[in-house]
Amino acid sequence: MPRSVWKGPFVDGYLLKKAEKSHEGGRKQAIKTWSRRSTIMPQFVGLTFQVHNGNKFVPVLVTEDMVGHKLGEFSPSRTYYGHAADKKAKRR
């Protein structure tokens, strides 16, 4: 179920402030964040975020296609090892 339209997208306030500072200063330094739940805004395009995945920080370069998605979508928190092979079939 999507978020109500009247509420608008959720973004942590400090992320907006850091993005504005980064644009004003012209710095290309990555913005470190634990806020995987924040929505990517148009102001974030071209910036690099380091999004925490529970273990380490994953660098995410924001492009126009990512606007409207969440930061956590681009920083996988689980490792997929594939399905276990059938031991009986393997032995034959």
Curated annotation (Swiss-Prot):
The keyword Ribosomal protein applies. Signal peptide: none annotated. One of its GO terms (biological process) is translation. InterPro entries: Ribosomal_uS19, Ribosomal_uS19_bac-type, Ribosomal_uS19_CS, Ribosomal_uS19_SF. GO terms for molecular function: rRNA binding; structural constituent of ribosome. GO terms for cellular component: cytoplasm; small ribosomal subunit. Residues 73-92 are annotated as: Disordered. The keyword Ribonucleoprotein applies. Keywords: Ribonucleoprotein, Ribosomal protein, RNA-binding, rRNA-binding. Protein S19 forms a complex with S13 that binds strongly to the 16S ribosomal RNA. NCBIfam families: rpsS_bact (TIGR01050). Belongs to the universal ribosomal protein uS19 family. This is Small ribosomal subunit protein uS19. It comes from Maricaulis maris (strain MCS10).
